[in-house]
Amino acid sequence: MRLSTLSSLLLGSSSIVFARVPPTVDNQEPIKSTSYFLDDPDFPSHFEFENPETNCKYVSQPWIYNAFNSVSEDMEAVFKYAHPDLHVRIMGHHPFAGYYHNPKMAFVNSLWRLNNCLKDAKVDAKLWAIHGGCDQAWSVQEFYFNATTNKGQPWELTSLWVSRWDEDGLIREVRTWVDAGQIMRTLWDNEIWFNSSDRVHHYDFIPGPGGLPPIANKTELGGEL
């Protein structure tokens, strides 16, 4: 087994047994909204599982809760449960969007970069809900993030993760949705440079969404590709 939190394999069965936890979790701190425009989110004082079953083929909802709920203290926590060949697709049209072929690149280019824009690299992250999982390979996690930016501005973000798990409790595939406008505004306001500066050494072509010019295949430039 790859995860210390797995309890055991059922003998003679392909099901995975995860540590039993109550069907509700009551230790969540109330969310304190920093939004100028919204009242405090209608966030429950305790987390209720749609399916509290822990005798599961894949991962149970209580196990998913324990795995993802620590992201506020450790941004890397999510990727501790990533398969080495995990593929991540960040949906939308913004600097984080794209298809990542390994978890390390996805983490550095998104969560790590975003975390560096937040004061003291601290963020309050909570789960709104968990759907699916258990005997289904796919699960959906709804997150709410709350922090203060390096410039002292209140910051909020809601994110949706759609995850495919294997029978060892590792994530094999992720599609995630974020607020593109919030991401772009946060990077623009809090990064000293926006993807590049005169201190960056460029060794790869970065032509933008339009791709390389047609002349690239007719000159020595084409031989370098």
UniProtKB/Swiss-Prot annotation:
Provide the alphabetized UniProt keywords.
Glycoprotein, Isomerase, Signal
The highest taxon in the source lineage is Eukaryota
User: Which residues are reported to be glycosylated?
Assistant: N146, N195, N217
**Into which EC class is this enzyme placed?**
isomerase
Entry's EC annotation: 5.-.-.-
Q: Which InterPro entries match?
A: NTF2-like_dom_sf (IPR032710)
What does the record give as the function of this protein?
A: Dimerizing cyclase; part of the gene cluster that mediates the biosynthesis of the antihypercholesterolemic agents phomoidrides which are dimeric anhydrides. Within the pathway, tstC produces the bicyclo[4.3.1]deca-1,6-diene core of phomoidrides via the dimerization of the monomeric anhydrides leading to prephomoidride. The pathway begins with the highly reducing polyketide synthase tstA that catalyzes the formation of a C12-fatty acyl-ACP, starting from one acetate and 5 malonate units. The hydrolase tstM is involved in the release of the C12-fatty acyl chain from phiA.
Protein name stated in the entry: Dimerizing cyclase tstC
Q: Which organism is it from?
A: Talaromyces stipitatus (strain ATCC 10500 / CBS 375.48 / QM 6759 / NRRL 1006)
Q: What is the lineage of its organism?
A: Eukaryota, Fungi, Dikarya, Ascomycota, Pezizomycotina
